[in-house]
A protein has these predicted regions:
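A short, charged helix-loop
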Residues: 105-128, 132-174, 230-236
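Short coil/turn connectors at secondary-structure junctions
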Residues: 8-12, 32-35, 50-53, 75-79, ...
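Gly-rich Lys/Arg/Thr-decorated short loops/hinges at beta-loop-alpha junctions or inter-strand turns
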Residues: 5-11, 72-79, 113-122, 141-142, ...
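N-terminal glycine-/serine-/threonine-rich phosphate-binding loop
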Residues: 4-60
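Glycine-rich nucleotide/cofactor/substrate-binding loop typically near the N-terminus or early
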Residues: 42-113, 205
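General beta-strand structural signal in soluble alpha/beta enzymes
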Residues: 15, 36-41, 55-59, 84, ...
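Active-site loops and adjacent core secondary-structure elements that bind or stabilize anionic groups
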Residues: 155-163, 168-277
Length: 277
């Protein structure tokens, strides 16, 4: 493969995020590399507060944010900039004809849908936290990973920063494909959460998408591997002992089920899922 085709310079970045913490170092580094920024609303104000020039999506598209912010980035001048194939002659003719700037980096994070559900908010507030523009930007940029870097959550800020420090404002095909994979993990998990909310008590199906959270000491037997998906550290504090194994998790589950039957403070010792003391 041609080296120059695989390594891409980042010239223009679209940034539209809900959570802005941890972003300033990335923005300053990109600015120092001569990258141009396009953004919306609060994110644009945040970028400009760092002393970095930033163009608005509204100026690019010729349309303001409408419908109470429900429609901001959904426009051919935005998505054409992301989806155009740099080596496709017809694509390049069309973006020239319609004056569409190519976008090489997209940084997005999504409205906090799961957190809003967990807060006990009413349905109207929950519905407003179903992201439309952000999820569309993620899918578009990830689809065109051969030309575009997509950063789909603040969990990927650290890998992006490491890449920029190593390579400057450029990326390899391997980098872009990795970020695309992570982006589809974000989008699939987000849609799974929305489905589970609407499915509710019907339980017609269960969709789960999670990150590889915890490697267990071993599986059911020592020669087997085990992995736990979920937020174990948020649910439990391990006070003593070795790393958790699969069988330990089964005992923990049995213990929680047992003590949930009691209103008073309860203590139990379990072995192989059975209370023994």
């Amino acid at each position: 493969r041609c080296f120059m085709l695989e390594n891409k310079k980042i010239k223009t970045a679209l940034v539209s995020v809900f959570h802005k913490d941890g972003l300033d170092e990335i923005l300053k580094l990109l600015h120092a590399e001569g990258v141009n920024f396009i953004s919306t609303g609060g994110t644009q104000s945040f970028i400009e507060s760092l002393g970095i020039p930033c163009g608005s999506v509204e100026n690019l598209t010729g349309y303001p944010s409408i419908l109470g912010g429900r429609v901001k980035t959904l426009h051919p001048k935005v998505f054409g900039g992301i989806l155009n194939r740099r080596e496709n002659e017809v694509d390049q003719q069309q973006i020239t004809q319609y004056e569409i700037p190519s976008i090489d980096l997209v940084i997005v994070d999504l409205y906090p849908f799961e957190e809003t559900v967990a807060s006990g908010a009413d349905e109207s507030a929950i519905i407003e936290k179903i992201d439309i523009g952000g999820i569309s930007l993620i899918r578009a940029a990830a689809k065109n990973y051969k030309d575009v870097v997509i950063v789909a959550s603040k969990a990927q800020y650290a890998p992006l920063l490491a890449m920029l420090k190593e390579k400057g404002a450029s990326s390899s095909l391997e980098d872009r494909r990795w970020f695309a994979k992570e982006a589809f993990a974000v989008s699939s998990g987000y849609d799974s959460a929305i489905f589970n909310y609407f499915d509710g008590d019907e339980a017609s199906a269960f969709r789960y998408a999670g990150n590889h959270a915890k490697t267990l000491r071993y599986g059911e037997n020592p020669h087997q591997k085990g992995v736990f998906y979920g937020n174990f550290e948020e649910m439990f504090d391990q006070l003593h002992g070795k790393e958790i194994s699969y069988n330990n998790l089964l005992d923990i589950d049995a213990a929680v089920s047992l003590i949930s039957e009691f209103d008073d403070t309860t203590f139990a010792i379990l072995k192989h899922n059975n209370a023994c003391g």
